[in-house]
């Protein structure tokens, strides 16, 4: 009986581990199954070796490794905190967070930009009492990450792939992507200006109201005591001196009526950030504690990573490696030299950065290559996509991105495109739309669920359920997609 129970427990444990593995690596498993399904139609042969774009995979590995090293020493987070520290209203803070995400996505890819910036946004907005704007900030950051990286070849994986596949000159790439990028930035800025509230930190407003109420109560109390003292003085002259002394003591009480005891600041924890119930700027002004590091860029907040002098040389070295990899993307340096330098340097300086590389993304890309290569060799599929890509490559690319995501759409449709312009624009603006249009959007959705579950006491977050967040997300993304399609269609 005991052995039977142990057997059942082992089976349940194994099933639980398999289910967790599937949940954590859903995208990789789906792409692997899709690739295996196409093998039934196109058996493996020598042509499979031609599916893989080795340079794309190598350059993507180099960028991920160097960005992981820079993130490990806190460079991106430190820079973002310095930017956010200069803004004191909800609107300006949201704009700074979204703008930082957009700029970061140009150099660190969209998914890494979101991984680094979303926790910082949650900590900043929750600390200042702006949790009502958190869903909006997450949606705008998601759009900024997906659309901001389109301007550079290494801003997102599909750009890197198409840049290499079609051997696009850098000048031509920039000229094609300038219009959709400019429209995207303008739309994001407009939304931040219209829908982000220009309110000061909520805890500061509450403390100001409480302080004013305390003053009024103290003034009323002193007036009542004064009248009582005058009445007693008229009736009992024998106690006049004691009453006068008491009156002088009352008059000596501070006019502001502020309570003498300090108010404890409650704290909540989210990820690596401590989230207090007070505004960091207001807390410093009131003498309740030191200004936090993301408020001044320096100070006593030990949670804020700082680039100390001992790490500056390493940061410069990593920056040089990043420049080397980017030079290989632009075909200035042979990519084996750049990637080899990254492996050797990080193997000596920071092996953890090599372990933090998103190997799942690289394997997913390899599966996409097999899936797309096999589909291109199926006559019916080839005829279908060849016809529709000739009719409207922009709409096909954007539409396919809504269903299978923009990275596999770029890999698949590149086999049927006569030119790169419409395909390049379509898969980039196609990152807006459904939740699966860009795999980075899943990062944002999961992060929002995590934040909401971690702060159940915040009513503004409790009201916006994951379903309500998804509805808002879809509405904003659909509006962006429609506008971008209408603007870009006449020019590609």
Regions found by a protein language model. Give the residues of each.
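Membrane-interfacial loop-to-helix junctions in multi-pass transporters
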Residues: 54-56, 84-98, 127-137, 380-396, ...
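Long, intrinsically disordered low-complexity tandem-repeat segments
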Residues: 207-239
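Long, contiguous bundles of hydrophobic transmembrane helices that form the permeation core
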Residues: 2, 8, 186-211, 215, ...
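Transmembrane helical segments that form the transport core of multi-pass membrane transport proteins
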Residues: 51, 73, 77-80, 321-418
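Juxtamembrane and boundary regions of transmembrane helices in multi-pass small-molecule transporters
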Residues: 135, 171-211, 243, 297-307, ...
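Hydrophobic transmembrane alpha-helices that form the pore/transport pathway of multi-pass ion
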Residues: 97, 103-150, 161, 411-424, ...
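Interfacial loop-to-helix junctions that mark the boundaries of transmembrane helices
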Residues: 19-23, 46-56, 170-180, 309-310, ...
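Hydrophobic mid-bilayer segments of alpha-helices in multi-pass membrane transport proteins
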Residues: 20-41, 53-65, 119, 314-324, ...
